[in-house]
């Protein structure tokens, strides 16, 4: 199978990239079902964009880098804030509908860490509406083909040039290559590394791992965001829109505890601060049933029914009417700020390999602001598509083949004759990550985590594979181990606390650590960021 452009992923970034290169032959290869898997369709809160004349790009830029602990890539942040409004209007052109004010302007709500109400929304199902519009528009173009239920297990890279990827067909178990002149990774994050996550089952870090295995540079992998509010036990997201509309957090003593952690911003502090606050309340015995209360019962019923409709239905399914009683919430693994290192054209250090969305690092720094992720998918999805389209104008397949790569994979599969249950190993890995590499970290725990991850890795070859599901779990476990090591080693390397990365043995934020940890192969290094690079964009 050959194509001009191969897009791996099925969320908002992948869809927007496909639209941008719609006049080329495009294959969107999706691990799940297009539009029904991935994180975009599940995103509830909103899309940040500057529309109000009293707001500004500088304010959005500053909020983003301040929230990100001043280790964001300032060039990428500038691109994000300046292009977000245009891409939101493109979404409306594609068919998505955003809520409007009575005067006809795009409605905007407050979100955490922002100095202005700039989060555009469609009730509390914004991501679903965005995907609906993107899919509707994509359906008009015959040159965009969609291949569902296929998992990328290896990139085809020769002499640092990417020529596509090798896939596992999740319906048949077949292994097959797709050759492409340009490849775009839009595979999202790795929330499934943790037992409590807002992410869907597809998010096992595949893009991080298959790119790293071929020599891609990754950045900020220690920065994993835990959304402050997930449903207790399941981790299912309770959108930030709940707090944006006036939701109040309090503990079992009915104390509004955020006053102890951020007296000024309270419930609308940045996600890292709120998540640690909730975690601390629970750990110190002030929680309730493993969480804390989040209450909107003081809001008018019509506000809840219109602006928090999804949340109302979500909790009614478990017997809780949020119009009358509080929710119980706790932190849930949510977003990877780190990922593939890209430039302003969404190029990686591998020629012909582009990346966009959550699989990339640099945009959000040490902590992502709510509402910036959906904007990220559209802004950088468009850029990745444009860059890939320009690349294929001057590059061909170069008579490449993947017979040897496919043969090695088949040999690897045939050698799996052990007796260990692969899913049990996945569960073991998740427990290790939650216990030692989650909201609060320390050196002893991180070192213990590495030992346990190494032990799990040694056992991978001893698993039994009985059918396609086991085979999928096997490749996912391999990827998850790679990503777990990247996160843990980076967290051990950064001897400070910044954003989502909190070291209780190094609780202070240190100026000498204002910069980025980069990993390529067995090498890891630190690149300092001078504060002046941010000042240049704020003048």
UniProtKB/Swiss-Prot annotation:
SUPFAM superfamilies noted in UniProt: FAD/NAD(P)-binding domain (SSF51905), Succinate dehydrogenase/fumarate reductase flavoprotein C-terminal domain (SSF46977), Succinate dehydrogenase/fumarate reductase flavoprotein, catalytic domain (SSF56425)
Keywords on record: FAD, Flavoprotein, Oxidoreductase
One Pfam family this sequence matches: Succ_DH_flav_C
Cofactor needs: FAD
Active site per the UniProt annotation: 227, 243
GO MF term (any one): oxidoreductase activity
List of residues binding FAD: 6-20
Family membership noted in the UniProt record: Belongs to the FAD-dependent oxidoreductase 2 family. FRD/SDH subfamily.
Name of protein: Uncharacterized FAD-dependent oxidoreductase MJ0033
Organism of this sequence: Methanocaldococcus jannaschii (strain ATCC 43067 / DSM 2661 / JAL-1 / JCM 10045 / NBRC 100440)
